[in-house]
Amino acid sequence: MDAETLLLETEESMLKAVDFAKQEFSGVRTGKASPGLVENLDVHVSSYGSVMKLKGLAVISTPEPRLILIQPFDPSTVHDIGRAINESKLNLNPLVEGRSIRLPIPALTEERRKDLVKLVKSQAEEARVRVRGARKAAMDSAKKLKAENIVTEDGQRDLETQIQKLTDKYVKEIDELVAVKEKDIMTI
């Protein structure tokens, strides 16, 4: 492995941590309806005998600010989808209406909003830990490259500086995502 490969692999690992944070945040409820709230929900489809993501089973739309409309491609999956929503941690009550499901999004209480902000912050910390883990692995690899005489001492220092810059960049990106999500949650 050379220095360039190390930096590319490190950046890829850090990007995965940011993507993890984005995906986790999309599942956190804000006061308004969003397809991202339910699209990654795991649904056990009894007629197929497998577990699938909701976005692979239905069209998810938001016809009103506080309503999600779920229209399954296969009408036989309506009740499986309703059950998955009931069993999720979203605290939502799906209304099965023939071939579709209406999912009203109630307004959040102040206490619930604060709990959701705490949840988002803990998810963000988990993502930051992943970024720092990628940094530690990269720093160890940089030391190994120096020990194997692939890079000079100055090269190692430059590499460590670049790794730290990547770390700072992705931690800042996670912090910005948290700020946006917190604002979304606290907006009534």
Swiss-Prot record:
Alphabetized NCBIfam families for the sequence: frr
Keyword Protein biosynthesis listed: yes
Annotated organism of origin: Akkermansia muciniphila (strain ATCC BAA-835 / DSM 22959 / JCM 33894 / BCRC 81048 / CCUG 64013 / CIP 107961 / Muc)
Name recorded for this polypeptide: Ribosome-recycling factor
Record's subcellular location: Cytoplasm
Source superkingdom: Bacteria
Record flagged with keyword Protein biosynthesis: yes
A GO cellular-component term linked to this record: cytoplasm
SUPFAM superfamilies given in the database record: Ribosome recycling factor, RRF
Example GO molecular function: ribosomal large subunit binding
Biological process annotations from GO: translational termination
Recorded family membership: Belongs to the RRF family.
Keywords: Cytoplasm, Protein biosynthesis
Physiological role: Responsible for the release of ribosomes from messenger RNA at the termination of protein biosynthesis. May increase the efficiency of translation by recycling ribosomes from one round of translation to another.
